[in-house]
C-alpha cells in the first residue's frame, strides 16, 4: 500500500512524500524536471523488504515552492527533514540533481549509508554555461518544447534519438510542466565549487551508480572525480543504460542498491 505524507522543512516549506513497504527505511531523492515518480519503479521492487520514502523536492507535486531566492541549502534541509521522519538508520539515495541534494544533506546531517547516481557536479566545466540564456528565453516565450530540447541536448547531452523517444513518450507533458523549475537548479549547479574535495568528509559507506551509456560530461567525469576523493566508495556500472535507469532498468538499479545495503 502506498500512503502520502509530508514534513515541514526548516524554512516552513511543506515537503511531500510517498511511503510504501516495510523494513529498514530508504529515502529517495529525484532529479531535475521530475518528481517522486522517477523512483517509484525501484521503490516498488524494494518495498517487500524496505520502507521506502519517495519525496517530492520543493516546487513540484505536493511539495511547496518555498520563499525566494532559491538556495540549494534549502534542498539539503528538505532532504534532512524527510530523513528525520524516516528515522536514524535510514539510507539516503539520490539521482542526478537529487544526488547533489543528497550529498549536501549527508555532509550536514550524517547518514548511515548513501547511494548517488550520477550527480552532475561541474567538475569538467559548467553544466548549462552558454546555453542557459537560450533556455531561459525559450521558457519566457512559452516555447517549452524548444526549451526541453535545448536542455536535454545541451545540459544532459542526450543523443537525438533518445530525445525523440522522450518527446513521443507519455513523459513529455510532465516534463513540460516542470521545465521552468530547471532554470534555478541549473543556476545553482553552475555556481557550485568545481572541486569535490569537500565530499571527502563523508563518513559513511557510499555506493556510486554510473550508466555505461551516460555522456562523459557532466556525468561520467563528475562520478570519476567524486570516486577519487571517496576511495572507499563502491562504484557500480549499470550496463547498457544511461542516465535514466531508474525508469528504464529499475530491476538493475534495485539489485545494485540492495546488494550494497546487504554488505
PLM ranges: what are they?
Residues 88-125:
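Conserved hydrolase catalytic core segment
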Residues 28-31, 96, 211:
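Glycine-rich His-Gly loop
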Amino acid at each position: 500500500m502506498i500512503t502520502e505524507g509530508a514534513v515541514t522543512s526548516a524554512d516552513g516549506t511543506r515537503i511531500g512524500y510517498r511511503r510504501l513497504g516495510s523494513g529498514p527505511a530508504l529515502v529517495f531523492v529525484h532529479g531535475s524536471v521530475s518528481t517522486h515518480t522517477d523512483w517509484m519503479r525501484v521503490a516498488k521492487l524494494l518495498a517487500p523488504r524496505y520502507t521506502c520514502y519517495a519525496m517530492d523536492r520543493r516546487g513540484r507535486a505536493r511539495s511547496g515552492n518555498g520563499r525566494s531566492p532559491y538556495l540549494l541549502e534549502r534542498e539539503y534541509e528538505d532532504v534532512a527533514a524527510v530523513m528525520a521522519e524516516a528515522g536514524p538508520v535510514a539510507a539516503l539515495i539520490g539521482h542526478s540533481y537529487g544526488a547533489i541534494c543528497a550529498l549536501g544533506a549527508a555532509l550536514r546531517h550524517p547518514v548511515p549509508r548513501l547511494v548517488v547516481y550520477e550527480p552532475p557536479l561541474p567538475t569538467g566545466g559548467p553544466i548549462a554555461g552558454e546555453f542557459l540564456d537560450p533556455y531561459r528565453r525559450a521558457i519566457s516565450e512559452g516555447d517549452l518544447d524548444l526549451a526541453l530540447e535545448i536542455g536535454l541536448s545541451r545540459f544532459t547531452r542526450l543523443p537525438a534519438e533518445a530525445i525523440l523517444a522522450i518527446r513521443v513518450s507519455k513523459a513529455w507533458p510532465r516534463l513540460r510542466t516542470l521545465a521552468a523549475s530547471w532554470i534555478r537548479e541549473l543556476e545553482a549547479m553552475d555556481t557550485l565549487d568545481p572541486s569535490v574535495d569537500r565530499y571527502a568528509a563523508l563518513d559513511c559507506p557510499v555506493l556510486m551508480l554510473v550508466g555505461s551509456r551516460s555522456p562523459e560530461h557532466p556525468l561520467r567525469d563528475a562520478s570519476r572525480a567524486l570516486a577519487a576523493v571517496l576511495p572507499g566508495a563502491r562504484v557500480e556500472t549499470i550496463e547498457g543504460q544511461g542516465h535514466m535507469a531508474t525508469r528504464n532498468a529499475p530491476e538493475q538499479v534495485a539489485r545494485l542498491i540492495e546488494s550494497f545495503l546487504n554488505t
